[in-house]
């Protein structure tokens, strides 16, 4: 089993991924600003509080890891609409050189449907509201994807659709081909289930699936 660092591991997809990885027997490091307040106890769980854009804090957290899950998020706020947002690209600029230096190859990064080349699959009805609400964040997520693809890491980019807090149903769809890409709902638990299964699955390296129900 791997020892996995989950960045953004105290909430949202990150927290669900921590739970899913623990359920599969992995050792997990939950890394986030609020990690010390994480209300989850498990003998294979370590918590490290830190800033994903701080080089020394990331280096300290990643030291014993075999793989990294990047599941960062920004809160819904006025800044999401007005921007600018650079968390995703800044954290990735911090992370990649450290992983390459320490020869930690496996990275799974969560972005979203509409980031990178999946933006072309947004239909005309959704495009205007998507750009108004999520434009700043997703431009930065697209920059994040570009950085990851330009690295030497064994990466998988995960692009969930509209997120819900519903319980896990393993009937979700993993849309690998651009011709299959479309928006749809997906639970955070389902995204985490995919990540936990993919972490040691070399067949997912270089893939960028869109996940929906």
Where are the regions a protein language model picked out?
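N-terminal Rossmann NAD(P)H-binding glycine-rich loop of SDR-like oxidoreductase domains
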Residues: 4-24
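Conserved glycine-rich Rossmann-like NAD(P)H-binding loop of the short-chain dehydrogenase/reductase
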Residues: 26-33
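Conserved Rossmann-fold NAD(P)-dependent oxidoreductase catalytic core, especially the SDR/UDP-sugar
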Residues: 29, 90, 94-136, 150
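NAD(P)H-binding glycine-rich loop region in Rossmannoid oxidoreductase-like domains
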Residues: 36-90, 94, 98-101, 199-203
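Conserved catalytic-site region of short-chain dehydrogenase/reductase
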Residues: 77, 113-119, 163-166
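Conserved beta-loop-beta element that borders a ligand/cofactor-binding pocket
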Residues: 145-167
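Substrate-positioning beta->alpha
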Residues: 158, 186-196, 207
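Glycine/proline-rich active-site loop of Rossmann-fold NAD(P)-dependent oxidoreductases
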Residues: 167-172, 198-207
């Amino acid at each position: 089993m791997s020892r996995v660092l989950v960045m953004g591991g105290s909430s949202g997809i990150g927290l669900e991924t921590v739970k899913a990885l623990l359920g599969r027997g992995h050792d997990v490091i939950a890394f986030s600003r609020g990690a010390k307040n994480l209300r989850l106890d498990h003998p294979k769980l370590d918590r490290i509080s830190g800033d994903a854009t701080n080089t020394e804090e990331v280096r300290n957290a990643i030291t014993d890891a075999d793989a990294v899950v990047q599941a960062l998020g920004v809160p819904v706020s006025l800044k999401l609409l007005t921007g600018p947002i650079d968390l995703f690209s800044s954290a990735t600029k911090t992370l990649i050189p450290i992983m390459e230096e320490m020869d930690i190859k496996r990275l799974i990064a969560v972005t979203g449907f509409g980031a990178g080349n999946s933006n072309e699959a947004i239909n005309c009805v959704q495009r205007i509201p998507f750009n108004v609400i999520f434009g700043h964040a997703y431009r930065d997520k697209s920059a994040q994807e570009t950085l990851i693809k330009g690295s030497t890491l064994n990466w998988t980019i995960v692009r969930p659709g509209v997120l819900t807090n519903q319980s896990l149903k393993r009937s979700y769809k993993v849309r690998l081909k651009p011709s299959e890409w479309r928006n749809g709902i997906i639970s955070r638990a389902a995204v985490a289930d995919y990540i936990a299964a993919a972490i040691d699955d070399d067949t997912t390296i270089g893939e960028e699936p869109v996940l929906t129900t």
